[in-house]
Amino acid sequence: MESESNKSKQKQKLEVYDILWESVVIYFRNLNFIIFTFLTSIPLFCIMVYFEIFLQELLVETSNIVNLPHESHDDSTVFTDYDFIDYRYSYRPDLIIDRFNKDYVLKLILTGFIYMVPLYVLEFVSAIVTIALASKLHSKEKKMTLKEMVQKPFDLSKLRGSFVTSVYVLFLTTTHQLGLLFIVLNYHVYLKDSSFYLLFAVICSAAFAKVLRMYLEWSAMWNMSLVMSVLEGIYGVDALAVSAYFSRGCHRRGLFLMLIFFAWGHLLRLSCYHIGGYEHGNAIFVQVGLYCMVNPLKWVACMIYVHDCKERKLEKKADEESGKDVKNGS
């Protein structure tokens, strides 16, 4: 009885490092699981290479447009020296907005479509397969064969409901990402060369940090809702509500867990962008390949995080109820 109590307490103390370590153990302990996740990641890899090429070309075009030197109001002379003040050559955001031509807008729409339809659907399929199989491997001592994984990777009856939850997650994720983009673009287009540059830089940095923190904290909760849909059969708004309940008091762990995977993905993307990866196919392949290798680990970690948050909450509830019983008995 005492050993069971100690075991329960140990489970309650899973921190970010413990979750990551346990996810690595689950992932690499079964070679068939590695092979299966690799095979299911191939379609995601292909479409993501295509998406990254478009995205990085778009980032280069955006950077070139935003950072173009300003033109004189009187003639076509271009001035790149901003050390003097002359109202004839003042900063005009409307000129930057005019540079976003039709081709740029079409490329932006196409990139958004690729992200929200084929890429997200393939990420969803990869996620639910990884979550379902990782949960089985987590709860069973027996290893699964590759044949067993192929025959029934997940419960098909939960597919539709899980997809509904993923649509909610997509909407919430996209709106917060657009919020971050809105802050950055406002700073570069309207505020960067204003008289109160330093003040606006501090305000925008603080706003960006706040929204990013919210995004990472809530990403853990949104990912938890998808895990709950796949494993528990709770969908949509109900899944989000349940995940909010179970993640209460665990936001710090969720924040750091999501920060690790967020930093990994963006570090790869920015590294590839700075070396001109969109012009050299090999760099894009390496970037996407490394991302797809770590992506299953993210969902295994989310599955463990959900189990741990649930155990903590249920244990706390049981302790509160037993405390009430003792108080009433006395």
Predicted regions located by residue number:
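Eukaryotic endomembrane system proteins
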Residues: 112-206, 213-227
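Juxtamembrane transition segments at transmembrane-helix termini in multipass membrane proteins
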Residues: 2-11, 18, 22, 43-92, ...
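Membrane-interface helix starts
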Residues: 25-39, 158-163, 248-256
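A short amphipathic helical element positioned immediately N-terminal to and/or at the very start
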Residues: 15-31, 91-100, 146-156, 236-248
